[in-house]
Amino acid sequence: MPYTPIDIQKEEADFQKEVAEIKKWWSEPRWRKTKRIYSAEDIAKKRGTLKINHPSSQQADKLFKLLETHDADKTVSFTFGALDPIHVAQMAKYLDSIYVSGWQCSSTASTSNEPSPDLADYPMDTVPNKVEHLWFAQLFHDRKQREERLTLSKEERAKTPYIDFLRPIIADADTGHGGITAIIKLTKMFIERGAAGIHIEDQAPGTKKCGHMAGKVLVPVQEHINRLVAIRASADIFGSNLLAVARTDSEAATLITSTIDHRDHYFIIGATNPEAGDLAALMAEAESKGIYGNELAAIESEWTKKAGLKLFHEAVIDEIKNGNYSNKDALIKKFTDKVNPLSHTSHKEAKKLAKELTGKDIYFNWDVARAREGYYRYQGGTQCAVMRGRAFAPYADLIWMESALPDYAQAKEFADGVKAAVPDQWLAYNLSPSFNWNKAMPADEQETYIKRLGKLGYVWQFITLAGLHTTALAVDDFSNQYSQIGMKAYGQTVQQPEIEKGVEVVKHQKWSGATYIDGLLKMVSGGVTSTAAMGQGVTEDQFKESKAKA
């Protein structure tokens, strides 16, 4: 027969059973804060007939419970960006989660092998591949430890420290590396490769910048919500409890792709001088005349001075203050009560209200002020981030505002603003190495900063690039000393401290799993092998005597 026979009744029964299972799954407490705009039937139809249970979903459950506990206790899961298996194995002793940074991957682990700054222009499998690299290392060290422990007696095991190597991983999904279908595929990759959670930011994909670079271009609020819905839908299709972190770069953004979403209208800049003309047309005309470089920049600068660039509410307030109106303060209050960062008032509504209050059509044109690339000028800020955080909250497990400084007052303003609308919302915070920490606060405040943020609801905090910076510092220091004092640098500043501090990598053969692999060889060869890696003659026997010679 050209086709495979199928029992239609069983097919229908299996579908209805799966729909019921999905509905039951979604009714669990895990999803009490999650909004879905699609049905269980939609998800069941998009699944294959073979059910695959991804271990990363167990890690997601572990992460969710971890953050739930921290939230209840007003404590914090704090971590940093891991570069490699050495990092995750050492971090596991002290930290309860792992971060995988797109910035670090861009500079050190692109699948194209081409280093780059954090522009998310590396292949989209770059960060998922790094997650898998670290996840496989976690699984291996977990197996290795278990085998080692189970060769000991129960009494010996009770005295032997246990390390939870399976710390859940949260990874950087940048802007999603494309449209909705790209985000669905990227999410699938992360699920398959071991991520417990991912974060996605509200920048435009083609112009994405590191959160601490200039020139950031936002997408409209709804477009980013669509990304978050895509992540959840993808996770639902593949049966994962993956956590989604919604990041907003709106605090320092200066451009936006579109004016389509009324929630963004308050923050879009326009020209208030009708004599200024259209900037893009002016620049194009200048270029057609062969004007480039500094002369072209001067034309743009002159236009900017002339245009009277401001937000619409600023233009209205200026009109009232400078015009011939009685009860100016009352007029301004009437306007700002209805038009403010969190009111979601459309420009059309704001313009209508302004005319009712002033009797004038106040000139304001955001089209003529567009940048040469076609983007609209945008003035973000903390309240803009609050607006976006509130909008993203129903579709994300955590909300993160990227900020320019480690400013506690600003962090509190954001937390209070989001939680005023969503009281139980979890928050995330980037303890960025781009901040000058010693300039920002004294050492005693640095020590308490994580805890203080934790009290505000920032349950997950991370130093994005600590893996990069600590590695650079250690290698720079060792290379310098090695160049001057040879093997004394290794013996005295690396190996001896490893021994004294009990860093297990000093016995790197054992750490890498040689004893575990010997056990596998013996198991499949009847208990005897002459090719055991850790047999007689292995040089690590030297470390049984760990005292350094004078």
UniProtKB/Swiss-Prot annotation:
Pathway: Carbohydrate metabolism; glyoxylate cycle; (S)-malate from isocitrate: step 1/2. A motif (Microbody targeting signal) lies at residues 548-550. Substrate binds at S101, G102, W103, G211, H212, R247, N430, L431, S432, P433, S434, T464. One of its GO terms (molecular function) is metal ion binding. CDD domains: ICL_PEPM. Keywords: Glyoxylate bypass, Glyoxysome, Lyase, Magnesium, Metal-binding, Peroxisome, Tricarboxylic acid cycle. Its cofactor is Mg(2+). Gene3D superfamilies: 1.10.10.850, Phosphoenolpyruvate-binding domains (3.20.20.60). The active site is at C210 (proton acceptor). Mg(2+) binds at D172. The keyword Glycoprotein does not apply. InterPro entries: ICL/PEPM, Isocitrate_lyase, Isocitrate_lyase_ph_CS, Pyrv/PenolPyrv_kinase-like_dom, Pyrv_kinase-like_dom_sf. SUPFAM superfamilies: Phosphoenolpyruvate/pyruvate domain. It catalyses: D-threo-isocitrate = glyoxylate + succinate; (2S,3R)-3-hydroxybutane-1,2,3-tricarboxylate = pyruvate + succinate. It is found in: Glyoxysome. Catalyzes the formation of succinate and glyoxylate from isocitrate, a key step of the glyoxylate cycle, which operates as an anaplerotic route for replenishing the tricarboxylic acid cycle. Required for growth on ethanol or acetate, but dispensable when fermentable carbon sources are available. Also acts on 2-methylisocitrate. Homotetramer. This is Isocitrate lyase. It comes from Candida albicans (Yeast). The gene is ICL1.
